[in-house]
Structure formats: C-alpha cells, structure tokens
Swiss-Prot record:
This is Large ribosomal subunit protein uL30. Gene3D superfamilies: Ribosomal protein L30, ferredoxin-like fold domain. One of its GO terms (cellular component) is cytosolic large ribosomal subunit. Part of the 50S ribosomal subunit. Keywords: Ribonucleoprotein, Ribosomal protein. The keyword Ribosomal protein applies. The gene is rpmD.
Length: 67
C-alpha cells in the first residue's frame, strides 16, 4: 500500500519592519526566515522552531496566512 501524504501546515510571513538599528540577533533571525528586505513574503513550514523565530521578531514581521 502507498503511504498517505500528510499535508504539512504552512505559515506565510511578510517583513514589515526594518532591521536597521536592531540587535544583530534580530537581523540574523530575519535572514533565517528568508526575510532580509522590506515587504518580502515567504511561505514556511509551520514548526515550533519557525514559530519561535517569528515570535522573536514579531515587531518586524506580519503573519499573512496560516494553512
């Protein structure tokens, strides 16, 4: 029998704040999320690690969509 593919949950985030004059760790977190320029949008797998990164820079990003 073929294994069923489970639809992975995703979260779409957009960078809405600039990392200028922010601690280096916040800039690195944005780069880790794939966001390094304003208004970039990325769709990421919804994992606890990604959620933690979003929470760490919640003042710089906006969650657009959760599926």
């Amino acid at each position: 029998m073929a294994k069923k593919e489970v639809a992975k949950k995703t979260v779409t985030v957009e960078q809405i704040g600039s990392p200028i004059r922010r601690p280096a760790v916040q800039r690195q977190t944005l780069v880790g999320l794939g966001l390094n320029k304003m208004h970039r949008v990325r769709t990421l797998e919804d994992t606890p690690a990604v959620r933690g990164m979003i929470r760490a820079v919640q003042h710089l990003v906006r969650v657009v969509d959760e599926k």
